[in-house]
């Protein structure tokens, strides 16, 4: 059985790690490099670096920051934010990223997924899917959650899989930063409908929430920020907790 992964996420804005609630109310969560070093030493399985204002403000991810982080960590690094072309993806890879995450640009131009996958392999393409429950439907949003799209979550997940995505990073906007647990209903819906890995995101506030994301949500990996950034729990502690409850993790 493949080991479940624990992935801390660095949401970066103006050169600092930040964390908000429901994609709003950002507060400072420390230095990018200090957090990256910490997670590298904490046995994180991977690290995600998201420039959360890049697409919204039509800025490009700061390559210098990516280069610094990639020089500090020896675990797979996924970089997202403002990646809207194969050429931009190439620059990010050349600065040390192992994977790129696309979101807004993929919705605007779905063929971008295929083009990056054809050049670098599906394993290097993560499609970030931000969803919000409207009525009884999970609607995909773009531009840092500001703009609803025509896509429902499952429809878009199946489409990105067909286009060559290697993973889906599924974030519940309703749960983001709330520490109320992942939206395991939407997680299970997507995880059981696609054959590529699904990363749970949005809402982790306890070690039990990580466990639930794997068991109830059927996720392949759990992404978290608040509980790790502010040292509520360590990744080592989280992995031991999961291991003790029968979840296969890398210790």
Curated annotation (Swiss-Prot):
Active site: 11, 130
Catalyzed reactions: 5-[(5-phospho-1-deoxy-D-ribulos-1-ylimino)methylamino]-1-(5-phospho-beta-D-ribosyl)imidazole-4-carboxamide + L-glutamine = D-erythro-1-(imidazol-4-yl)glycerol 3-phosphate + 5-amino-1-(5-phospho-beta-D-ribosyl)imidazole-4-carboxamide + L-glutamate + H(+)
Keyword Lyase in annotation: yes
Subcellular location: Cytoplasm
Transmembrane segments: none
GO terms, biological process: L-histidine biosynthetic process
UniProt pathway: Amino-acid biosynthesis; L-histidine biosynthesis; L-histidine from 5-phospho-alpha-D-ribose 1-diphosphate: step 5/9
Keywords: Amino-acid biosynthesis, Cytoplasm, Histidine biosynthesis, Lyase
Predominant location: cytoplasm
Molecular function terms, GO-annotated: imidazoleglycerol-phosphate synthase activity; lyase activity
E.C. code: 4.3.2.10
Chain's role: IGPS catalyzes the conversion of PRFAR and glutamine to IGP, AICAR and glutamate. The HisF subunit catalyzes the cyclization activity that produces IGP and AICAR from PRFAR using the ammonia provided by the HisH subunit.
Quaternary data: Heterodimer of HisH and HisF.
Family membership noted in the UniProt record: Belongs to the HisA/HisF family.
Record's protein name: Imidazole glycerol phosphate synthase subunit HisF
């Amino acid at each position: 059985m493949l080991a479940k992964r624990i992935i801390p996420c660095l949401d970066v804005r103006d050169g600092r790690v930040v964390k908000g609630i429901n994609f709003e109310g950002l507060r400072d969560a420390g230095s990018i490099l200090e957090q990256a070093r910490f997670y590298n030493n904490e046995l994180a399985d991977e690290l995600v670096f998201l420039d959360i204002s890049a697409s919204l403000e039509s800025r490009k991810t700061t390559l210098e920051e990516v280069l610094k982080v990639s020089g500090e960590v020896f675990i797979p690094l996924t970089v997202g934010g403002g990646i809207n072309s194969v050429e931009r993806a190439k620059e990010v890879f050349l600065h040390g990223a192992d994977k790129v995450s696309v979101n807004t640009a993929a919705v605007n131009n779905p063929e971008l997924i295929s083009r990056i996958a054809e050049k670098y392999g599906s394993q290097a393409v993560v499609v970030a899917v931000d969803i919000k429950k409207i009525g009884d439907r999970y609607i995909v949003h773009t531009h840092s959650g500001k703009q609803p799209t025509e896509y429902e979550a499952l429809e878009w997940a199946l489409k990105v899989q067909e286009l060559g995505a290697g993973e889906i990073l599924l974030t519940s906007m309703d749960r983001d930063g709330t520490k109320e647990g992942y939206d395991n209903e939407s997680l299970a819906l997507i995880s059981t409908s696609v054959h590529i890995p699904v990363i749970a995101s949005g809402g982790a506030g306890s070690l039990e929430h990580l466990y639930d994301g794997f068991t109830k949500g059927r996720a392949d990996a759990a992404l978290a920020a608040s509980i790790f950034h502010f040292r509520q729990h360590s990744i080592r502690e989280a992995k031991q907790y999961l291991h003790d409850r029968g979840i296969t993790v890398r210790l």
